Amino acid sequence: MTQLADLRRNYMLSALSETDVAPDPIRQFQSWFDEAMQAKLPEPNAMTLATVGADGQPSARIVLLKGMDADGFTFFTNYESRKGVDLLANPRAALLFHWVQLERQIRVEGIVEKVEDAESDAYYASRPLGSRLGAWASEQSREVAGRDVIEAREADFRNKFGENPPRPPHWGGYRLKPTWIEFWQGRPSRLHDRIAYRQNADGNWQIVRLSP
């Protein structure tokens, strides 16, 4: 059996210089995301979302990025889920994209706020019927006696709404407005390149290199 201590690889694919990155972190993110798409990575929009509850307990899970612009990074979920409860108590959160095949990570920190209802409505309407009904059927993060309970709830809402379920009031979008974005490129000998963008009080971005 392979020992965990022996599992390692050397990163050789690319390099990252502060003189080569875009002056704006969103443009730099878009550039790297485009490369991830061109490389046909599986679910390049999958990201770890880390939150902290009112009790100080952190939690993390994978969610999907569904929008990105100068205002931030958008995802959708149940407002009553653990992440929703955490964000209500503490809107500070972090995102992590890990693209193994490109030997890259992107880490984002910032403040999360709900998107406008119209944006949540539009995205909800674009989802497959099963996903729209699932948003009603799932009391996300709550204990449940068995899968049959969830499936029965889904059937009940399917009978109630047919093919036109409205958006549940407990479901919608969040946007993380970044204050810090770090781009990590694996390099040989664990001397990785880490270029970070730090937002100053005036809203401008300062580019810094971090020690690996």
UniProtKB/Swiss-Prot annotation:
Keyword annotations for this protein, in alphabetical order, are: Flavoprotein, FMN, Oxidoreductase, Pyridoxine biosynthesis
Entry-linked PROSITE patterns: PYRIDOX_OXIDASE
The UniProt entry, under Gene3D superfamilies, shows:
Electron Transport, Fmn-binding Protein, Chain A (2.30.110.10)
Cofactor(s) demanded: FMN
Enzyme Commission code(s) on record: 1.4.3.5
Pathway membership of this protein?
A: Cofactor metabolism; pyridoxal 5'-phosphate salvage; pyridoxal 5'-phosphate from pyridoxamine 5'-phosphate: step 1/1; Cofactor metabolism; pyridoxal 5'-phosphate salvage; pyridoxal 5'-phosphate from pyridoxine 5'-phosphate: step 1/1
Task: Give the record's cofactor note, including how many are bound.
Answer: Binds 1 FMN per subunit.
Query: What is one Gene Ontology biological process annotated in the Swiss-Prot or TrEMBL record?
Result: pyridoxine biosynthetic process
- Family annotation (InterPro entries): Pyridox_Oxase, Pyridox_Oxase_CS, Pyridox_Oxase_N, Pyridoxamine_oxidase_dimer_C, Split_barrel_FMN-bd
UniProt enzyme class:
oxidoreductase
**Oligomeric and partner information:** Homodimer.
Q: What is this protein called?
A: Pyridoxine/pyridoxamine 5'-phosphate oxidase
Species this chain originates from: Cupriavidus metallidurans (strain ATCC 43123 / DSM 2839 / NBRC 102507 / CH34) (Ralstonia metallidurans)
Lineage, opening ranks? Bacteria, Pseudomonadati, Pseudomonadota, Betaproteobacteria, Burkholderiales
